[in-house]
Amino acid sequence: MRKSFLSILLLCSIATYAQEATSDNGGQLIKNHSFEEEAKPIRNRRFGPNGEGELFGGYLPSGIIPGWIGANSEGAVSQMETTTKKLLNKEQCQSLCWSITEATPTSPAGIANVGHNGIEAIKGNKYTLTFWVRADKRYKGRLHVGLQSKLSDGTWYAQTIVKGKIKKRWKKYTVTFVAEGDAENARFVITADTPGTLYIDEVSLYSPVATKR
């Protein structure tokens, strides 16, 4: 039992180190891109509908998934937590479980990543996103991704739709988009337009120009 527990801790430590090394050396714009930061062997972190650290039935109220916050539109309801079930592969210790209760195309649910110190949007610059996602059978919608203002006005500096149906099994998606405006402190956002549950892992965002600054 002890050997198994130590093995889990070692795997999580290796994953966290690799993630930080990628961020430092490879130009990764997403903070905590594989949801391994502060990994623990139990699920104890959950967000409220809009990212506030609310208490949900025994879960710690911290709302802490480093780098990630809620970004729901008015009228949308969703929450996220880390999970250790049905992971992407044996190397991963946990992934993101995003439960969407209320969402429509005109009032989508959203999650956002604030980057390491904000994400710089540079007009005309191309960004390449890769991520893995799977959905439960209830989710019938599409996903939009892009760069958005951190302010309450919700200004989009770049936005595009993820092509293809989100399936029940893990699938990797690659998306590119071009910024239409400048901002030093934008955030990366994923929006969903129907209720259901999504599982997300290995979210990576790169930009040749932005990472040189």
Model regions and ranges:
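Positively charged n-region of N-terminal signal peptides that target proteins for export
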Residues: 1-4, 19
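Extracellular and organelle-lumenal recognition/adhesion modules and their flexible linkers in secreted
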Residues: 19-213
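Sec/Tat signal peptide C-region and signal peptidase I cleavage site
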Residues: 14-18
